[in-house]
Amino acid sequence: MKTLSKLNLLFAISVILWGCANDDNLQEVLPVNSENTEESLYLENGNEVIIYPNGVAVEKLPDGRIVWGGDIALNEKQLQALTEPDTRAGILRDNSMFWPDGIVYYTLADDVMRSGAYIDIYDAMKHIEERCNISFHKKQSNTKNWIEFVLSEDDVSRSHLGMTGGKQNIWVTSDVNTSTAIHEICHALGMIHEHQRMDRDNYIVVDFNNIRPEWHQWFYRTSIPHNTYGTGLEPLDTKSIMIYGSYGENTAINPDFPYMWRKTDGTTWTNNNVLSEMDILTLNAVYSKPHYTITCKPQCTLSGTVSGSDHYAKGEICALQAFPEDNRG
């Protein structure tokens, strides 16, 4: 577990102000940098936390990867969009980040096979395939974009956000479970965390006072619409596979108390192990089934028999020849 060497670094990352225990007075205050320059803090494990002038905080790993929200590896284009001066905590989204026709190609690294992690990865892919318009196929020699599942070197599972082009990794632990594999694959399909939605404060309370300082950047809100991507599915989904549970032994300062709860009635929720109904609707809204126009050429034969005066019975046999590869449009 990562820890900060100085407690006062808590205030350099974010501060939560409370007013008379009234949720309406809860305010998330991101860092203010009047000099318009980047600032850096270091965790005890040596990882660097970079705070940008707009208040966005990301973690830089020793291998150079930039991580946002705890387990989302950003490419250069996404990092630039995230850290634009006018972007409070957003990220660039466009159609190029989605996998064409919902077809995802993949490979499994040797260490994943040796560790047995591939079993849960296969189970995760099957779970998604059975519920969504998405299919997973092993990489072919001419495949241009694909996912390679590799073992994580720091015991944390992570993924890129959406299709990034070429080979992209999903890092899993040797003891990864199916639900974590589903979660990371969903990041690769373009989904973000439900608890980082721009409107999350309308539905839940995030108690930064009970979140370890080094985890604060995992819970900053985004400034883009949530996972539904315009499907009109408004309520925050506490059953989603993309939301953390209300309690966390490693996340919470006091694990006996929740760090997130529902705003309406104060109830909590647990980690979810499967895609929720809204997760499925969201993925199927983004990855709708492809529609093809197929040209068919009829070939018919006509045969008949005469069975008496003025009576004629005929039978028509037709065969349709379709050429989908040449006539998709």
For every predicted segment, state its role.
Residues 1-9:
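Bacterial N-terminal signal peptides that target proteins for export
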Residues 17-19:
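C-terminal motif of bacterial Sec signal peptides marking the signal peptidase cleavage site
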Residues 292-293, 312-319:
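Short coil/turn motif common to extracellular beta-sandwich-like domains
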Residues 295-310:
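Short, solvent-exposed loop/edge segments of extracellular or virion-exposed proteins
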